[in-house]
């Protein structure tokens, strides 16, 4: 099992998104915890341009620390904006994200389906911070049309998959609570609509367990389309991202199913918004290493 460290580590420590100085600090701390593979993100236009602009320095620091960037995620909600000009601009930014991922030597570039363009009353998912266990209430505009939103999403994901393929990268997407694609079946429907062999899945155990999915069945549904795993635990009631073993995720079932489908990608520790973060990442890494040895995965 190849184990890496999610960018949620940096976000939990330094805010959303971390500044460039804190990006370097996060990488140093990831290396100190024993990780060799890491994620990076570019959140919105300003942060994406900042990370891309500093890519030579970031890559050099990763090399010094013995780190490999296994996944880069440009977070661009405007890929599904109702205004076409905003979607086109977001796609141009995604191209910058692909160039950045390629420069880092990543094999994957990740995207999100984003929150739907509804009016949230109170908390909005992933707006200013990555918070878990929230309750969402929305107002639906009478002019809202689901078919139009789905069309924007499929068109944008198709364009993103093509752009990634041109650079030799795989495109992956994770279903997340509160977003347009929030479960395995929605992702399968999106994959069918996009119809690209280059488009794969991030199996995020924390989000899917909170959606009451039977996780080994989720693995069976996605099969060889799983490119990457985000590993966190919870009690199935909320989408908390606790250390593996701290909730009731069926870890044996998940990894035996992954083994059946010959999964060989990275499993990333995706723990956040918990006390004693460093200790929880160490325990998570040890838990996954022990699981891998016991199940021979």
What are these language model-derived features?
Residues 56-58, 88-90, 127-128, 189-191, ...:
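Short, hinge-like loop/turn segments at secondary-structure boundaries
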Residues 67, 106, 169, 261-265:
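A short helix->loop->beta-strand "cap" motif at the edges of active sites that frequently abuts
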Residues 1-108, 118-119, 150, 154, ...:
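N-terminal pre-domain/capping segments
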Residues 8-12, 41-43, 74-77, 114-116, ...:
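Active-site beta-loop-alpha junctions enriched in small/polar residues
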Residues 20, 37-38, 64, 69-72, ...:
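Acidic/histidine-rich catalytic cores of soluble enzymes
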Residues 117-136:
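Aromatic- and acidic-residue-enriched segments that line the glycan-binding/catalytic groove
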Residues 249-259:
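A short, acidic, amphipathic alpha-helical segment used as a generic capping/interface helix at domain edges
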Residues 35, 101-106, 226, 231, ...:
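A structural motif
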């Amino acid at each position: 099992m190849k184990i890496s460290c999610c960018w949620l580590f940096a976000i939990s420590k330094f805010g959303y998104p971390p500044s460039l100085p804190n990006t370097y600090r996060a990488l140093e701390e990831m290396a100190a915890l024993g990780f060799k593979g890491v994620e990076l993100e570019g959140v919105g236009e300003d942060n994406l341009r900042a990370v891309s602009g500093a890519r030579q320095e970031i890559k050099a620091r990763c090399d010094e620390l013995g780190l490999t960037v296994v996944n880069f995620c440009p977070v661009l909600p405007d890929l599904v904006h109702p205004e076409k000009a905003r979607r086109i601009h977001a796609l141009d930014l995604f191209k910058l994200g692909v160039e950045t991922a390629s420069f880092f030597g990543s094999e994957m570039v990740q995207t999100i389906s984003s929150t739907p363009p509804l009016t949230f009353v109170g908390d909005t998912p992933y707006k200013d911070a990555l918070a878990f266990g929230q309750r969402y209430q929305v107002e639906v505009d009478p002019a809202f049309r689901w078919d139009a939103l789905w069309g924007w999403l499929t068109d944008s994901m198709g364009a993103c998959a093509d752009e990634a393929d041109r650079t030799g990268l795989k495109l992956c997407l994770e279903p997340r609570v509160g977003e347009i694609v929030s479960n395995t079946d929605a992702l399968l429907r999106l994959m069918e609509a996009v119809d690209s062999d280059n488009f794969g899945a991030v199996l995020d155990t924390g989000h899917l367990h909170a959606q009451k999915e039977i996780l080994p069945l989720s693995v069976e549904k996605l099969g060889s389309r799983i490119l990457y795993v985000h590993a966190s635990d919870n009690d199935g009631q909320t989408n908390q991202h606790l250390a593996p073993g701290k909730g009731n995720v069926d870890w044996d079932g998940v990894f035996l199913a992954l083994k059946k489908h010959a999964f060989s990608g990275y499993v990333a520790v995706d723990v956040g918004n918990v006390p004693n973060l460093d200790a929880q990442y160490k325990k998570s890494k040890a838990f996954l290493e022990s699981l891998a040895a016991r199940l021979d995965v």
